[in-house]
């Protein structure tokens, strides 16, 4: 199964959007480092932040998983980013090129739990 985790960039209040814009370089660097360190596991960086409108941004990773234990590292990464930068995250699967969200977690949604996310994904 191909999953994705994205930083929630839509429906942000002005204050949240400003903070996201300020932290964008650090977030991109952290995700780039994770993708490069896990390239052997086919982790791919999703970095579509060219638009002037935050709501159109897509920033995160995708990676194949076959067991719930494969979710530990990416969920830990995004939980850490959520805590450090005050963001929320979206997790889901990719099927036929389309992203299907299954859960949200982070600063406002609460910490992401690997077991629950695995259940939502059907792992």
Regions found by a protein language model. Name each.
Residues 1-30:
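Short, extreme N-terminal segment that most often corresponds to the first beta-strand
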Residues 7-9, 36-38, 83, 119:
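Intrinsic disorder/low-complexity segments
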Residues 17-21, 34, 41, 73, ...:
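General "foldedness" signal
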Residues 25-35, 79-88:
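A common structural junction motif
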Residues 32-50:
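Short, glycine- and small/hydrophobic-rich beta-strand elements in well-ordered beta-sheets
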Residues 48-123:
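Charged interaction segments
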């Amino acid at each position: 199964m191909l999953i994705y985790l994205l930083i929630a960039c839509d429906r942000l209040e002005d204050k949240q959007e400003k903070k996201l814009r300020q932290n964008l370089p650090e977030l991109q660097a952290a995700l780039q480092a994770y993708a490069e360190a896990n390239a052997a596991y086919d982790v791919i960086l999703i970095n579509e932040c060219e638009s002037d409108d935050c709501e159109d941004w897509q920033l995160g990773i995708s990676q194949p998983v076959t067991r719930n234990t494969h979710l530990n590292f990416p969920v830990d990464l995004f939980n850490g980013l959520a805590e450090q930068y005050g963001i929320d995250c979206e997790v889901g699967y990719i099927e036929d090129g389309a992203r299907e969200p299954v859960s949200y977690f982070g600063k406002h949604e609460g910490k992401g739990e690997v077991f629950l996310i695995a259940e939502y994904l059907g792992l």
